[in-house]
């Protein structure tokens, strides 16, 4: 969700040229996702993240688009849910890797020990074990997130 719309759109030509291509659709509670984007300053080209209404529409566009592509290429697109990964990391990661025809390794659970460079907004987070505090984080600010709760029909 944190990229331009073209970045989250699988290309039909690519899917035809590389029929075994795997797309990972990583989903998270929409309010947590949108609020996380809103409070993160992104570089050029991410102006939609400065407005909660724009972020909400962008998120919905992503869901509609990926669901469309999933209808065309159901075996290529795997949806993984953030909250489920946090609750059952080994099981969910194994299912994802199985979909990608990749063997599970214990290092998948120890990703935070890697010393590889990371150039994303989550560069500090990937240096820590998975944590549950991001689940329903939006509720701490629910009084200021009426736009999001309305878009996604959530009660405070």
Regions found by a protein language model. Give the residues of each.
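Active-site-proximal structural scaffolding
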Residues: 7, 19, 23-26, 48, ...
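PAPS-dependent sulfotransferases, especially Golgi type II membrane carbohydrate sulfotransferases
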Residues: 1, 37-79, 86-156
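A general structural signal for short secondary-structure junctions and capping/turn motifs
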Residues: 14-17, 70
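Alpha-helical elements of the RecA-like P-loop NTPase motor core of helicases
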Residues: 9-12, 35, 94
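Glycine-rich phosphate-binding loop used to anchor ATP phosphates in small-molecule kinases
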Residues: 1-15
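Conserved phosphate-donor/acceptor-positioning beta-strand/loop module used by diverse small-molecule
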Residues: 17-39, 96
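Structured core elements
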Residues: 22-25, 78-82
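Short, solvent-exposed loop/turn segments at secondary-structure junctions
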Residues: 5-8, 29-32, 40, 83-87
